[in-house]
Amino acid sequence: MAEYTLPDLDWDYAALEPHISGEINEIHHTKHHAAYVKGVNDALAKLDEARAKDDHSAIFLNEKNLAFHLGGHVNHSIWWKNLSPNGGDKPTGGLATDIDETFGSFDKFRAQFSAAANGLQGSGWAVLGYDTLGNKLLTFQLYDQQANVSLGIIPLLQVDMWEHAFYLQYKNVKADYVKAFWNVVNWADVQSRYMAATSKTQGLIFD
């Protein structure tokens, strides 16, 4: 069985400064994200052992561990692509139009997304996703690494609100971190995800 691996980044750790420090990015990538990758592979190995023994309690435990660690791996893999030293500004094209139609304006969307991030209790993510059943954009809070999200939603933009993503630089002032995040959003990546979600998902989950 092929193992999950830690992806390389498209930019140097210090490339997002002063908005997100190189120290944070290096620790975040090589320690935290790497731990999720290891957790996924460990959970899969333990699942194989549990299945071979028909140990259902161990199967259920490691399925939960797999969901958590795989969620962490997926979320962080999106996170690194969502960021760019050449980011910021605003989206364009179909994504910009859809944001305006859904939220009223980009500024209103940004305020709603930021409120979701700043208002998150405990650890998790704020997410802009595309609902493939309703064919609409949604913002929501993702709890921990995998909870509070219905199936069929494609993540487009995420901000990591776990303390390891900001505390070394912003301490407990989450609002400053979220404000800085907008300066490094890679809208080209978000637009690419939006185009794929709106054109390639038909029939994958819903007819």
UniProtKB/Swiss-Prot annotation:
The keyword Manganese applies. Keywords: Manganese, Metal-binding, Oxidoreductase. Transmembrane segments: none annotated. InterPro entries: Fe/Mn_Superoxide_Dismutase, Mn/Fe_SOD, Mn/Fe_SOD_BS, Mn/Fe_SOD_C, Mn/Fe_SOD_N, Mn/Fe_SOD_N_sf, SOD_C_sf. It is an enzyme of class 1 (oxidoreductase). It holds the Pfam family Sod_Fe_N. It catalyses: 2 superoxide + 2 H(+) = H2O2 + O2. Its cofactor is Mn(2+). Mn(2+) binds at residues 28, 76, 160, 164. One of its GO terms (molecular function) is metal ion binding. Its EC number is 1.15.1.1. Binds 1 Mn(2+) ion per subunit. Belongs to the iron/manganese superoxide dismutase family. Destroys superoxide anion radicals which are normally produced within the cells and which are toxic to biological systems. This is Superoxide dismutase [Mn]. It comes from Mycobacterium leprae (strain TN).
